[in-house]
Design a protein with these regions (language model features):
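Residues in the helix-turn-helix
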Residues: 45
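Short coil turns linking two alpha-helices in DNA-binding domains
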Residues: 41-42
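Short helix->loop/beta-hairpin flanking segments within DNA-binding domains
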Residues: 9-27
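Alpha-helical residues within helix-turn-helix
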Residues: 27-28, 33-34
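Residues within the alpha-helical elements of helix-turn-helix
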Residues: 34, 38, 205
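HTH-adjacent hinge/linker in prokaryotic transcriptional regulators
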Residues: 2-9, 24, 37-38, 48-130, ...
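Structural motif
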Residues: 27, 129, 148, 212-213
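C-terminal regulatory/effector modules of DNA-binding transcriptional regulators
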Residues: 126, 139, 143-144, 154-251
Length: 251
């Protein structure tokens, strides 16, 4: 049997100290040099052990301050289901309410953004064709739990009251309801989930370690004429969320 890598042994040691209440939630850990000296390893080994525990939500790093024992954090249940599109209210807000968490989100919309090649392919338009791009940061009790970047062809919503997803009389109503307001009926959505490591920007926004595991969901909404009318890249951190799919059964 191969020997356990040193950083995994140190991670187990740090985890054990936390379990035995040597360090409590919110406590700052000793320096890497001190931990390394106590455990007989170099600082790089301690760093890798801490990065692993940060990605698992056991520790948290604070820029310019050090590494701390993470406060207990409820893992958020993220439900994916077409049946959850409601005329009023947000599915995300419903999920958070069920967990007794305060739901909120921050967004930024840029109109008339040229579609990159991949987005153009997903929307069935020419590369460079104008789109409305909206970025979201979803929060549960003020802590980020999900990122999303949405793209809608300007040719579909331009000049209408729903051109801005988070502005106007239909602000925050969701893709299905907003499209219905301009006579576009959504028939179905296609989602492609894929595990990967977080980028540096995603890690910073989500408060997780760089390269921590996330689930990247590519979602596209289609009209009843089989036309793609919105596509989004949704990023969910594995350490903080569990993704559940509800599949309606029609009889």
């Amino acid at each position: 049997m191969s020997e356990q890598p040193p950083y995994l042994r140190i991670a187990d040691e740090l985890r054990q100290r936390i379990a035995e209440h040597v360090w409590e939630p919110g406590d700052r850990l000793p320096s890497r040099a001190q931990i390394g000296q106590e455990c007989g390893v170099g600082e790089n080994v301690v760093r890798r052990a801490q990065e692993l525990l940060i990605s698992q939500g056991v520790l948290e790093g604070r820029a310019g301050s050090g590494t701390y024992v993470a406060e207990p954090r409820q893992r958020v249940r993220v439900v994916r289901s077409s049946a959850r599109e409601q005329p009023s209210g947000s599915p995300f807000r419903q999920d958070m309410k069920a967990l007794r968490l305060q739901a909120d989100w921050e967004s930024r919309t840029d109109a008339k953004v040229p579609a990159p090649a991949e987005i153009a392919t997903r929307l069935g338009i020419a590369e460079g064709e104008l789109c409305v791009r909206t970025t979201y940061e979803f929060l549960a009790d003020g802590k980020p739990v999900q990122l999303s970047t949405s793209w809608e062809p300007y040719a579909v919503t331009g000049g209408t009251l729903v051109v801005l997803p988070e502005g106007g009389p239909h602000a925050g109503a969701g893709v299905v309801n907003r499209m219905a307001a301009i006579g576009v009926t959504i028939s179905h959505a296609v989602e492609q989930p894929e595990p990967r490591h977080a980028t540096a920007e995603e890690a910073s926004l989500l408060g997780i370690q760089k390269a921590a595991l996330v689930t990247h969901i590519r979602r596209t909404y289609y009209s009843d004429e089989s036309r793609p009318v919105e596509t989004a890249d949704i990023v969910v951190p594995a350490a903080h969320c569990e993704i559940v799919y509800e599949i309606p059964i029609n009889r």
